[in-house]
Amino acid sequence: MTIAIGKSEQKRGWFDLLDDWLRRDRFVFVGWSGLLLLPCAYFALGGFLTGITFVSSWYTHGLASSFLEGCNFLTAAVSTPPNSMGHSLLFLWGPEAQGDFTRWCQLGGLWTFVALHGAFGLIGFMLRQFEIARSVKIRPYNAIAFSAPIAVFVSVFLIYPLGQSGWFFAPSFGVAAIFRFILFFQGFHNWTLNPFHMMGVAGVLGAALLCAIHGATVENTLFEDGDGANTFRAFNPTQAEETYSMVTANRFWSQIFGVAFSNKRWLHFFMLFVPVTGLWMSALGVVGLALNLRAYDFVSQEIRAAEDPEFETFYTKNILLNEGIRAWMAAQDQPHEKLVFPEEVLPRGNAL
Protein backbone atom coordinates (compact mmCIF):
# COMPACT_ATOMS: atom_id res chain seq x y z
CA MET A 1 0.00 0.00 0.00
CA THR A 2 1.34 3.48 -0.96
CA ILE A 3 0.72 6.45 1.30
CA ALA A 4 1.03 9.91 -0.27
CA ILE A 5 1.83 12.72 2.13
CA GLY A 6 1.08 16.34 1.25
CA LYS A 7 -1.65 18.40 -0.32
CA SER A 8 -3.11 17.59 -3.68
CA GLU A 9 -2.45 20.24 -6.27
CA GLN A 10 -5.38 22.62 -6.51
CA LYS A 11 -6.96 23.09 -9.89
CA ARG A 12 -6.00 26.45 -11.36
CA GLY A 13 -8.79 28.54 -12.81
CA TRP A 14 -8.80 31.07 -15.63
CA PHE A 15 -8.08 33.92 -13.20
CA ASP A 16 -4.81 32.31 -12.06
CA LEU A 17 -3.74 31.65 -15.64
CA LEU A 18 -4.51 35.25 -16.61
CA ASP A 19 -2.68 36.52 -13.53
CA ASP A 20 0.39 34.49 -14.49
CA TRP A 21 0.37 35.84 -18.04
CA LEU A 22 -0.21 39.47 -17.05
CA ARG A 23 2.48 39.53 -14.35
CA ARG A 24 5.07 37.50 -16.24
CA ASP A 25 8.60 38.91 -16.23
CA ARG A 26 9.02 40.46 -19.68
CA PHE A 27 10.72 43.47 -21.28
CA VAL A 28 7.60 45.63 -20.89
CA PHE A 29 5.59 44.69 -17.81
CA VAL A 30 1.84 44.50 -18.50
CA GLY A 31 0.14 43.65 -15.22
CA TRP A 32 -3.47 44.17 -14.25
CA SER A 33 -2.95 47.92 -14.38
CA GLY A 34 -1.92 47.53 -18.01
CA LEU A 35 -5.47 46.50 -18.89
CA LEU A 36 -6.47 50.07 -18.04
CA LEU A 37 -3.28 51.95 -18.90
CA LEU A 38 -2.33 50.57 -22.31
CA PRO A 39 -5.64 50.93 -24.21
CA CYS A 40 -6.45 54.29 -22.59
CA ALA A 41 -3.00 55.72 -23.31
CA TYR A 42 -3.19 54.39 -26.89
CA PHE A 43 -6.59 55.96 -27.53
CA ALA A 44 -5.72 59.27 -25.82
CA LEU A 45 -2.48 59.69 -27.78
CA GLY A 46 -4.07 58.50 -31.02
CA GLY A 47 -7.02 60.86 -30.60
CA PHE A 48 -4.70 63.77 -29.84
CA LEU A 49 -2.49 63.15 -32.89
CA THR A 50 -5.55 62.71 -35.11
CA GLY A 51 -7.07 65.95 -33.82
CA ILE A 52 -4.03 68.19 -34.22
CA THR A 53 -3.35 66.75 -37.69
CA PHE A 54 -6.78 66.77 -39.35
CA VAL A 55 -9.59 68.27 -37.24
CA SER A 56 -10.69 71.90 -37.49
CA SER A 57 -12.10 74.02 -34.65
CA TRP A 58 -14.12 76.17 -37.02
CA TYR A 59 -17.45 74.82 -35.80
CA THR A 60 -16.60 75.05 -32.07
CA HIS A 61 -14.37 78.12 -31.70
CA GLY A 62 -14.24 79.70 -35.14
CA LEU A 63 -10.54 78.83 -35.31
CA ALA A 64 -8.08 76.85 -37.38
CA SER A 65 -6.38 74.29 -35.14
CA SER A 66 -4.80 71.53 -37.25
CA PHE A 67 -1.67 70.96 -39.31
CA LEU A 68 -3.95 70.47 -42.31
CA GLU A 69 -5.13 74.09 -41.95
CA GLY A 70 -1.65 75.55 -41.60
CA CYS A 71 -1.02 75.44 -37.84
CA ASN A 72 2.36 74.45 -36.44
CA PHE A 73 3.09 72.27 -33.41
CA LEU A 74 2.69 75.26 -31.07
CA THR A 75 -0.65 76.49 -32.42
CA ALA A 76 -2.35 73.18 -33.28
CA ALA A 77 -4.82 71.85 -30.70
CA VAL A 78 -7.67 69.47 -30.00
CA SER A 79 -10.36 72.01 -29.15
CA THR A 80 -13.12 71.76 -26.59
CA PRO A 81 -16.74 71.25 -27.72
CA PRO A 82 -18.93 74.34 -28.22
CA ASN A 83 -20.77 75.81 -25.24
CA SER A 84 -24.07 74.60 -26.70
CA MET A 85 -23.01 71.00 -26.03
CA GLY A 86 -22.91 71.66 -22.28
CA HIS A 87 -21.50 68.70 -20.38
CA SER A 88 -22.48 66.05 -22.92
CA LEU A 89 -19.98 63.18 -23.09
CA LEU A 90 -20.35 63.36 -26.87
CA PHE A 91 -20.26 59.66 -27.57
CA LEU A 92 -19.80 58.83 -31.24
CA TRP A 93 -23.06 56.87 -31.11
CA GLY A 94 -24.86 59.56 -29.07
CA PRO A 95 -27.72 61.81 -30.15
CA GLU A 96 -25.35 64.63 -31.17
CA ALA A 97 -23.16 62.81 -33.73
CA GLN A 98 -25.46 59.81 -34.40
CA GLY A 99 -22.58 57.64 -35.54
CA ASP A 100 -21.24 60.16 -38.07
CA PHE A 101 -17.47 60.37 -37.44
CA THR A 102 -17.03 63.62 -39.38
CA ARG A 103 -19.82 65.32 -37.48
CA TRP A 104 -18.44 63.93 -34.21
CA CYS A 105 -15.07 65.58 -34.92
CA GLN A 106 -16.76 68.85 -35.92
CA LEU A 107 -18.68 68.92 -32.62
CA GLY A 108 -15.52 68.48 -30.52
CA GLY A 109 -16.04 64.81 -29.71
CA LEU A 110 -12.30 64.20 -29.88
CA TRP A 111 -11.76 66.48 -26.88
CA THR A 112 -13.98 64.45 -24.54
CA PHE A 113 -12.46 61.28 -26.02
CA VAL A 114 -8.90 62.43 -25.28
CA ALA A 115 -9.74 63.95 -21.88
CA LEU A 116 -11.52 60.90 -20.48
CA HIS A 117 -9.10 58.33 -21.90
CA GLY A 118 -6.21 60.53 -20.76
CA ALA A 119 -7.55 60.71 -17.20
CA PHE A 120 -8.03 56.95 -16.98
CA GLY A 121 -4.62 56.41 -18.61
CA LEU A 122 -2.94 58.52 -15.92
CA ILE A 123 -4.80 56.62 -13.21
CA GLY A 124 -3.69 53.37 -14.86
CA PHE A 125 -0.07 54.58 -14.78
CA MET A 126 -0.37 55.30 -11.04
CA LEU A 127 -1.85 51.83 -10.47
CA ARG A 128 1.05 50.41 -12.49
CA GLN A 129 3.48 51.97 -10.02
CA PHE A 130 1.52 50.47 -7.11
CA GLU A 131 1.54 47.06 -8.78
CA ILE A 132 5.25 46.98 -9.60
CA ALA A 133 6.16 48.37 -6.16
CA ARG A 134 4.23 45.49 -4.59
CA SER A 135 5.96 42.98 -6.88
CA VAL A 136 9.49 44.16 -6.05
CA LYS A 137 8.57 44.76 -2.39
CA ILE A 138 9.20 48.49 -2.07
CA ARG A 139 7.03 51.25 -0.67
CA PRO A 140 4.45 52.88 -2.99
CA TYR A 141 5.64 56.49 -2.60
CA ASN A 142 6.18 56.84 -6.36
CA ALA A 143 2.49 56.18 -6.96
CA ILE A 144 1.50 58.56 -4.17
CA ALA A 145 3.72 61.27 -5.71
CA PHE A 146 2.17 60.68 -9.14
CA SER A 147 -1.26 61.35 -7.67
CA ALA A 148 -0.31 65.06 -7.66
CA PRO A 149 -0.18 65.57 -11.46
CA ILE A 150 -3.31 63.41 -11.75
CA ALA A 151 -5.08 65.73 -9.30
CA VAL A 152 -4.02 68.76 -11.37
CA PHE A 153 -5.15 67.17 -14.65
CA VAL A 154 -8.53 66.09 -13.29
CA SER A 155 -9.18 69.44 -11.57
CA VAL A 156 -8.24 71.57 -14.60
CA PHE A 157 -9.62 69.47 -17.46
CA LEU A 158 -12.65 67.88 -15.79
CA ILE A 159 -13.70 69.48 -12.48
CA TYR A 160 -13.33 73.11 -13.60
CA PRO A 161 -15.51 72.83 -16.74
CA LEU A 162 -18.03 70.74 -14.76
CA GLY A 163 -18.43 73.73 -12.45
CA GLN A 164 -18.87 76.06 -15.43
CA SER A 165 -21.51 75.91 -18.15
CA GLY A 166 -19.83 73.24 -20.27
CA TRP A 167 -16.65 71.56 -21.54
CA PHE A 168 -16.14 74.69 -23.66
CA PHE A 169 -14.41 76.42 -20.73
CA ALA A 170 -11.82 73.66 -20.21
CA PRO A 171 -8.38 74.04 -21.81
CA SER A 172 -8.01 72.71 -25.33
CA PHE A 173 -5.13 70.25 -25.81
CA GLY A 174 -2.38 72.36 -27.36
CA VAL A 175 0.48 74.66 -26.38
CA ALA A 176 -1.00 78.02 -27.44
CA ALA A 177 -4.41 76.77 -26.27
CA ILE A 178 -3.05 76.24 -22.75
CA PHE A 179 -1.58 79.76 -22.81
CA ARG A 180 -5.02 81.10 -23.75
CA PHE A 181 -6.50 79.22 -20.81
CA ILE A 182 -3.91 80.70 -18.43
CA LEU A 183 -4.79 84.23 -19.60
CA PHE A 184 -8.47 83.36 -19.19
CA PHE A 185 -7.86 82.14 -15.63
CA GLN A 186 -6.07 85.37 -14.77
CA GLY A 187 -8.60 87.69 -16.35
CA PHE A 188 -11.72 85.99 -15.04
CA HIS A 189 -10.48 84.58 -11.71
CA ASN A 190 -7.40 86.66 -10.74
CA TRP A 191 -5.65 83.30 -10.38
CA THR A 192 -2.16 84.63 -9.65
CA LEU A 193 -3.40 86.25 -6.43
CA ASN A 194 -5.04 83.01 -5.27
CA PRO A 195 -3.24 81.51 -2.24
CA PHE A 196 -3.61 77.99 -3.65
CA HIS A 197 -1.81 79.08 -6.82
CA MET A 198 0.88 80.66 -4.64
CA MET A 199 1.35 77.33 -2.83
CA GLY A 200 1.55 75.54 -6.18
CA VAL A 201 4.23 77.91 -7.47
CA ALA A 202 6.16 77.61 -4.21
CA GLY A 203 5.96 73.83 -4.47
CA VAL A 204 7.11 73.55 -8.09
CA LEU A 205 9.87 76.17 -7.91
CA GLY A 206 10.90 74.98 -4.46
CA ALA A 207 11.18 71.44 -5.80
CA ALA A 208 13.34 72.67 -8.69
CA LEU A 209 15.63 74.41 -6.19
CA LEU A 210 15.81 71.33 -3.96
CA CYS A 211 16.51 69.12 -6.98
CA ALA A 212 19.37 71.36 -8.16
CA ILE A 213 20.88 71.60 -4.66
CA HIS A 214 20.56 67.87 -4.05
CA GLY A 215 22.04 66.88 -7.40
CA ALA A 216 24.96 69.26 -7.00
CA THR A 217 25.64 68.12 -3.43
CA VAL A 218 25.66 64.42 -4.29
CA GLU A 219 27.84 65.09 -7.33
CA ASN A 220 30.22 67.09 -5.14
CA THR A 221 30.63 64.31 -2.58
CA LEU A 222 30.41 61.29 -4.88
CA PHE A 223 34.11 61.23 -5.74
CA GLU A 224 37.12 62.23 -3.74
CA ASP A 225 39.34 64.75 -5.48
CA GLY A 226 43.09 64.31 -5.33
CA ASP A 227 45.85 66.72 -6.30
CA GLY A 228 45.02 66.44 -9.99
CA ALA A 229 41.41 67.56 -9.62
CA ASN A 230 39.86 69.77 -12.24
CA THR A 231 36.42 71.04 -13.17
CA PHE A 232 35.55 68.01 -15.30
CA ARG A 233 36.84 65.35 -12.89
CA ALA A 234 33.32 64.37 -11.82
CA PHE A 235 32.43 63.35 -15.37
CA ASN A 236 35.53 61.21 -15.81
CA PRO A 237 36.10 59.48 -12.48
CA THR A 238 39.16 57.33 -11.95
CA GLN A 239 38.21 55.93 -8.55
CA ALA A 240 37.34 52.28 -8.17
CA GLU A 241 34.56 53.00 -5.69
CA GLU A 242 32.28 55.90 -4.87
CA THR A 243 33.03 57.92 -1.76
CA TYR A 244 29.62 59.53 -1.15
CA SER A 245 29.45 60.97 2.33
CA MET A 246 26.27 62.23 3.99
CA VAL A 247 28.41 63.54 6.84
CA THR A 248 30.50 65.69 4.48
CA ALA A 249 27.38 67.03 2.78
CA ASN A 250 25.89 67.81 6.19
CA ARG A 251 29.03 69.71 7.22
CA PHE A 252 28.97 71.71 3.99
CA TRP A 253 25.35 72.88 4.31
CA SER A 254 25.69 73.45 8.03
CA GLN A 255 28.42 75.94 7.23
CA ILE A 256 26.44 77.52 4.36
CA PHE A 257 23.02 77.91 5.99
CA GLY A 258 23.61 77.05 9.62
CA VAL A 259 21.15 74.14 9.23
CA ALA A 260 21.18 70.93 7.21
CA PHE A 261 19.22 67.71 6.85
CA SER A 262 20.34 65.22 9.47
CA ASN A 263 19.51 62.02 7.58
CA LYS A 264 18.65 60.78 4.10
CA ARG A 265 15.08 59.78 4.91
CA TRP A 266 14.07 63.26 6.07
CA LEU A 267 15.89 64.89 3.15
CA HIS A 268 14.21 62.76 0.49
CA PHE A 269 10.81 62.90 2.17
CA PHE A 270 11.06 66.70 2.06
CA MET A 271 11.93 66.55 -1.65
CA LEU A 272 8.81 64.41 -2.13
CA PHE A 273 6.60 66.54 0.11
CA VAL A 274 7.31 69.98 -1.39
CA PRO A 275 6.24 69.46 -5.04
CA VAL A 276 3.45 66.96 -4.30
CA THR A 277 1.83 69.19 -1.69
CA GLY A 278 2.20 72.22 -3.97
CA LEU A 279 0.42 70.45 -6.84
CA TRP A 280 -2.31 69.14 -4.55
CA MET A 281 -2.93 72.65 -3.22
CA SER A 282 -3.05 74.04 -6.75
CA ALA A 283 -5.60 71.38 -7.71
CA LEU A 284 -7.73 72.34 -4.69
CA GLY A 285 -7.59 75.97 -5.81
CA VAL A 286 -8.86 75.06 -9.28
CA VAL A 287 -11.76 73.14 -7.71
CA GLY A 288 -12.57 76.38 -5.87
CA LEU A 289 -12.52 78.29 -9.14
CA ALA A 290 -14.89 75.73 -10.63
CA LEU A 291 -17.37 77.01 -8.05
CA ASN A 292 -16.40 80.63 -8.86
CA LEU A 293 -14.98 81.18 -5.37
CA ARG A 294 -12.93 84.36 -5.08
CA ALA A 295 -9.68 84.59 -3.17
CA TYR A 296 -8.09 87.90 -2.19
CA ASP A 297 -10.39 90.79 -3.15
CA PHE A 298 -9.06 93.96 -1.54
CA VAL A 299 -12.24 95.95 -2.06
CA SER A 300 -11.14 98.84 0.17
CA GLN A 301 -8.19 99.52 -2.15
CA GLU A 302 -10.44 99.36 -5.21
CA ILE A 303 -12.89 101.86 -3.67
CA ARG A 304 -10.11 104.25 -2.69
CA ALA A 305 -8.52 103.98 -6.15
CA ALA A 306 -11.88 104.79 -7.73
CA GLU A 307 -12.27 107.87 -5.51
CA ASP A 308 -8.67 109.09 -5.59
CA PRO A 309 -6.92 109.18 -9.00
CA GLU A 310 -3.55 109.56 -7.28
CA PHE A 311 -3.95 106.37 -5.24
CA GLU A 312 -2.87 103.18 -7.00
CA THR A 313 -1.32 99.92 -5.85
CA PHE A 314 0.00 96.95 -7.75
CA TYR A 315 -3.26 95.24 -6.80
CA THR A 316 -5.50 97.92 -8.33
CA LYS A 317 -3.27 97.99 -11.41
CA ASN A 318 -3.69 94.23 -11.78
CA ILE A 319 -7.47 94.53 -11.39
CA LEU A 320 -7.50 96.96 -14.32
CA LEU A 321 -5.35 94.58 -16.34
CA ASN A 322 -7.81 91.78 -15.60
CA GLU A 323 -10.67 93.96 -16.81
CA GLY A 324 -8.71 94.57 -20.00
CA ILE A 325 -8.17 90.84 -20.49
CA ARG A 326 -11.88 90.19 -20.06
CA ALA A 327 -12.99 92.98 -22.39
CA TRP A 328 -10.55 92.15 -25.17
CA MET A 329 -10.81 88.39 -24.78
CA ALA A 330 -14.51 87.74 -24.32
CA ALA A 331 -15.73 88.62 -27.83
CA GLN A 332 -13.01 86.51 -29.47
CA ASP A 333 -12.97 83.72 -26.93
CA GLN A 334 -16.72 83.21 -26.59
CA PRO A 335 -18.15 83.72 -30.09
CA HIS A 336 -21.41 82.02 -29.09
CA GLU A 337 -22.23 85.03 -26.87
CA LYS A 338 -22.10 87.38 -29.89
CA LEU A 339 -20.60 90.12 -27.71
CA VAL A 340 -20.15 93.57 -29.26
CA PHE A 341 -18.41 96.23 -27.16
CA PRO A 342 -18.54 99.91 -28.15
CA GLU A 343 -15.10 101.28 -28.94
CA GLU A 344 -15.04 103.66 -25.99
CA VAL A 345 -15.32 100.91 -23.35
CA LEU A 346 -12.34 98.92 -24.63
CA PRO A 347 -9.19 99.79 -22.68
CA ARG A 348 -6.21 100.81 -24.80
CA GLY A 349 -2.58 101.20 -23.84
CA ASN A 350 -0.38 104.09 -24.93
CA ALA A 351 0.90 102.10 -27.90
CA LEU A 352 -2.62 101.76 -29.31
Swiss-Prot record:
Binding of Fe cation, residues: 214, 268
Membrane topology per record: Multi-pass membrane protein
Positions contributing to chlorophyll a PD2 binding: 197
Endoplasmic reticulum in keyword set: no
Cofactor: binding comment: The D1/D2 heterodimer binds P680, chlorophylls that are the primary electron donor of PSII, and subsequent electron acceptors. It shares a non-heme iron and each subunit binds pheophytin, quinone, additional chlorophylls, carotenoids and lipids. There is also a Cl(-1) ion associated with D1 and D2, which is required for oxygen evolution. The PSII complex binds additional chlorophylls, carotenoids and specific lipids.
GO cellular-component term (any): photosystem II
RNA-binding recorded as keyword: no
Residues modified to N-acetylthreonine: 2
GO molecular function annotation: chlorophyll binding; electron transporter, transferring electrons within the cyclic electron transport pathway of photosynthesis activity; iron ion binding; oxygen evolving activity
Record-listed pheophytin a binding positions: 129, 142
Family matches, as SUPFAM superfamilies: Bacterial photosystem II reaction centre, L and M subunits (SSF81483)
GO biological process, one term: photosynthetic electron transport in photosystem II
Catalytic activity: 2 a plastoquinone + 4 hnu + 2 H2O = 2 a plastoquinol + O2
Keywords for this protein: Acetylation, Chlorophyll, Chloroplast, Chromophore, Electron transport, Iron, Magnesium, Membrane, Metal-binding, Oxidoreductase, Phosphoprotein, Photosynthesis, Photosystem II, Plastid, Thylakoid, Transmembrane, Transmembrane helix, Transport
Places the protein is found: Plastid, Chloroplast thylakoid membrane
Something else known: 2 of the reaction center chlorophylls (ChlD1 and ChlD2) are entirely coordinated by water.
NCBIfam families: psbD
Family per similarity comment: Belongs to the reaction center PufL/M/PsbA/D family.
HAMAP family found in the cross-reference section: PSII_PsbD_D2 (MF_01383)
Task of the protein: Photosystem II (PSII) is a light-driven water:plastoquinone oxidoreductase that uses light energy to abstract electrons from H(2)O, generating O(2) and a proton gradient subsequently used for ATP formation. It consists of a core antenna complex that captures photons, and an electron transfer chain that converts photonic excitation into a charge separation. The D1/D2 (PsbA/PsbD) reaction center heterodimer binds P680, the primary electron donor of PSII as well as several subsequent electron acceptors. D2 is needed for assembly of a stable PSII complex.
Protein name (Swiss-Prot/TrEMBL): Photosystem II D2 protein
Source species: Oltmannsiellopsis viridis (Marine flagellate)
Organism ancestry: Eukaryota, Viridiplantae, Chlorophyta, Ulvophyceae, Oltmannsiellopsidales
